[in-house]
Amino acid sequence: MTFYSSGEEAQHQWKQLQTQQNKKNSPRPVTSSRDFRSRVQGNQSNTIFTHLTKSAANSQCQLQKDLKKTLQLQHFLQTLEQKTSPSKHKRKRTKYRRTKKSKHHSRKKTTSSSSSSERDSTTGRESESS
């Protein structure tokens, strides 16, 4: 315990009062990241926040209804297009295949004597085989 004279004592008490008042407002050293965050963010009140207000909730419901209608209309359109458009896989097949017409090859004309002998030789062969 220290003893002060009356003037010194008054000054000492006055300094203590000033330091006590300043301690409330004076900065404290930051000891942790949690302490730092609490100082930066400040005091947050414990209020309950709603994500959507009434008007926003109503607009959200309306948007969902419109989305359902749009999806239904798209599905309906696809089914109509499938029914009305000719299908690529449902082509009718012909019953009988068309035969290719054989091309007639023209023979070179040769002398009449040689052509007649060729005809005779071919007919002779045919008659021999039959």
From Swiss-Prot:
Comp. bias intervals (Polar residues): 13-33
Instruction: Provide the residue span(s) of the region labelled Disordered.
Output: 1-47, 78-130
What ranges does the record list as Basic residues composition bias? 86-110
- According to the UniProt entry, which residue ranges have a biased composition of type Basic and acidic residues? 117-130
Which residues belong to the signal peptide in this entry? none
Protein's recorded name: Uncharacterized ORF3 protein
Per the UniProt record, the source organism is Torque teno mini virus 1 (isolate TLMV-CBD279)
